[in-house]
Structures are given as structure tokens and as C-alpha cells.
């Protein structure tokens, strides 16, 4: 079974680590963040759910890249969040530096991992990770469509007062410039 590292213990990263653990499809999940105590706390919360939800995935939190050694898959969610009034393009310079540093540290400790970038703006961050990694292009890719589509379906479900399970929608955009519906439906 695989070892997966999730870099960034914010909402998206912590949720990713939690879901991976609950699915019980990997041996170990490492949740890494520059705020090591936060990563440790969220990882501990997830690990302590194991006896109740009956999974065996090990979950650890850290701020030390050495703990990511041997990762088969790395999910990068790290970056500054978008604040009100900011576009995703406003994040480019800062988040590109973060993603570059993260990627360089990851490849120092893991041989030929698959890197999945979630940080925004996704297209630019994926390129930054690819260039910093030195890996083959088949090893680095970005994932945004599922998350953005899920958010869109949730917005529509709320606006229409129905279950999100009843909404079928797919967004096919490189970037979404909305954070909430712009008008009621």
C-alpha cells in the first residue's frame, strides 16, 4: 500500500488527509504544514477516529520534510488563501514561490513521486511544480475540476433548496472567478 503526503493542513489539505484515511486505501498519510502543531493536531484528530470508523491508515502530522521520505504520491494544497477582493491571479507570485519550495523539498526526500497540485491558480502552480521537480511530465498534474464542480453543485443545491445529490453539473473552465453565485436562481 502507498504512502501519501498532503502538503498544507488548511481546510482542503486536512479534508484530503481525512478522506484518504477513511477510505483505508493507503498505508500512511503524512499531513505536512509550516504550522507543525496544527498539522499534528489535525492528523491526531483523524488518527483517533480510526477505532470508531474502523480504518487502519496511519496518519501523522509534521512540519519536517524528512517525514515525507518515500512518499508515492504528494498532494500540494499549500499556499496563501484568496481573500475578499482578490482574484486567483493575485496569488501567482506568492503561491508560485511556495509551490516551488514545497516541490524542491519533496523531491529531496521521495524518489519519483506522483505530484498532484491543488494550489491556486492551478495552471500556473502545476507548471511551477513541474519545473521545480525535475520529474517526467507524466508525474506532475493539477486537479481542480472536481473541487470546483462540487462547490458549484453545492451552490446550486442551496439556491434551489434541493440535495446536492440531485444536481448534475460539470464545470469546464481553467479558472473560476466566482466564489458564490452572482444571482439567485
Language model: regions and residue ranges:
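Conserved N-terminal Rossmann-fold NAD(P) cofactor-binding segment
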Residues: 32-71
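N-terminal Rossmann-like NAD(P) cofactor-binding module of classical short-chain dehydrogenase/reductase
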Residues: 74-75
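Glycine-rich Rossmann-fold phosphate-binding loop(s) that bind the pyrophosphate
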Residues: 9-10
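Rossmann-like NAD(P)(H) cofactor-binding subdomain of soluble oxidoreductases
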Residues: 87-153
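Conserved NAD(P)H cofactor-binding loop of Rossmann-fold oxidoreductase domains
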Residues: 78-80
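N-terminal Rossmann-fold NAD(P) dinucleotide-binding loop
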Residues: 13-14
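Single conserved hydrophobic/aromatic residue that forms the stacking wall/gate
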Residues: 176-185
